[in-house]
Structure formats: C-alpha cells, structure tokens
C-alpha cells in the first residue's frame, strides 16, 4: 500500500489544499494529512476543528472514506512522522517559484536525512495559485466573501468564528 503524507497547518483548509489532496489520491492508496502543531503559533482553528473540516471535505466533496484519508497531528520532524506511519512519499504543493525554491531546499534536507522518502511536488491549479490561508483569514476577519477560496463547510466555520469574535469585540 502506498501511503502519502501531506503536511501543513491547514488553518483554514483552502480550495488550493483540496486540489493538492485530490492529486495525492491519484498517486497513493492512502493519504495521511498531518497538521503541524506549533506551540508558538496561534491558530484560528483548533486541531480538532481542522480535523473535522478536513474529514468532512474528504467525505462530502472528494467521496473519500476513512480507509483512504487519515488526519493526524505532528510536532516532530516531518520525516520522523513519515517513517512512523510508513509513508512512501511526502506531498508538497507548489503555487509559484518562491514555493519551489523553499520546497526544493526542504526536499534536499529531507533527502539527506531520509533517503528512502521521496518528495512529490504537485502544482497548484491556476485558480489556486493566489490562495493562502493567511489571506483567507484576513478577508474573512473583515467580513469579506471567501466562498471562491474555501469549501462551504470551511466558509461556514470562518463566518461563525469571526461573527463570534466581532460580537465579543475582539476580531483578530
């Protein structure tokens, strides 16, 4: 069984992430989405909320069951988590040349530390190249329409999150 590991913060999950996830299922029998947990980084959505959002997208939009999609956390080196779950390769999405430069550097370092793990780069779709979780959060925090950038369940979750923040007078 070929297992792919797709890591990120997914805060929130965007249509760009989903396109990369779809491409991952063409290459792998099972995809493990690994949400990076960083103590110093304040997330908008909790780990549990992100798991729910990703799992729901897998089921509802991609028609992928729990036998092919698993969501986990990691706070270690990515290669250590990949080895732990038996991953055959790492999936990385590329939006532009800046991503490529960074990801090639990371793939090179990972290749030295874990030569048995390959990194597979999947290019973002034309419509997904401009999407970043940071921009989506900023637009949503100001009450903007993010429906073109995220799936419906994430759009609802963002709306609820920021509506609550605005009602309490603390928009981040």
Curated annotation (Swiss-Prot):
Gene Ontology, cellular component aspect: cytoplasm
InterPro entries per record: Cyt_trans-like, PPAT, Rossmann-like_a/b/a_fold
Coiled coil: none
Pfam families: CTP_transf_like
Annotated site location: Transition state stabilizer: 17
GO MF term set: ATP binding; pantetheine-phosphate adenylyltransferase activity
Catalytic activities: (R)-4'-phosphopantetheine + ATP + H(+) = 3'-dephospho-CoA + diphosphate
Location in or out of the cell: Cytoplasm
Positions of ATP binding: 9-10, 17, 93-95, 103, 128-134
One GO BP annotation of this record: coenzyme A biosynthetic process
Cleaved signal peptide residues: none
Positions that bind substrate: 9, 41, 78, 92
Main location: cytoplasm
Keyword set, alphabetical order: ATP-binding, Coenzyme A biosynthesis, Cytoplasm, Magnesium, Nucleotide-binding, Nucleotidyltransferase, Transferase
UniProt keyword annotation of Nucleotide-binding present: yes
Domain of life: Bacteria
Role this protein plays: Reversibly transfers an adenylyl group from ATP to 4'-phosphopantetheine, yielding dephospho-CoA (dPCoA) and pyrophosphate.
NCBIfam families, alphabetized: coaD_prev_kdtB, cyt_tran_rel
Family the UniProt entry places it in: Belongs to the bacterial CoaD family.
Name of the featured protein: Phosphopantetheine adenylyltransferase
The species this protein was found in: Bartonella quintana (strain Toulouse)
């Amino acid at each position: 069984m070929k297992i792919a590991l797709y890591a990120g913060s997914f805060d929130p999950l965007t249509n760009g992430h989903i396109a990369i996830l779809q491409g991952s299922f063409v290459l792998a029998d099972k995809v493990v989405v690994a949400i990076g947990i960083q103590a110093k980084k304040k997330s908008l959505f909790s780990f549990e909320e992100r798991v729910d959002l990703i799992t729901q997208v897998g089921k509802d939009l991609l028609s992928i069951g729990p036998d092919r999609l698993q969501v986990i956390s990691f706070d270690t080196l990515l290669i250590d988590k990949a080895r732990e779950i038996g991953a055959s390769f790492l999936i990385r999405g590329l939006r532009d040349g800046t991503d490529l430069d960074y990801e090639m550097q990371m793939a090179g370092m990972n290749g030295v530390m874990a030569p048995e793990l390959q990194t597979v780069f999947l290019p973002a779709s034309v419509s997904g190249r401009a999407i970043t979780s940071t921009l989506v959060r900023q637009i949503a925090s100001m009450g903007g329409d993010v429906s073109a950038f995220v799936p419906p369940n994430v759009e609802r979750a963002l709306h609820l999150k920021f509506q609550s923040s605005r009602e309490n007078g603390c928009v981040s």
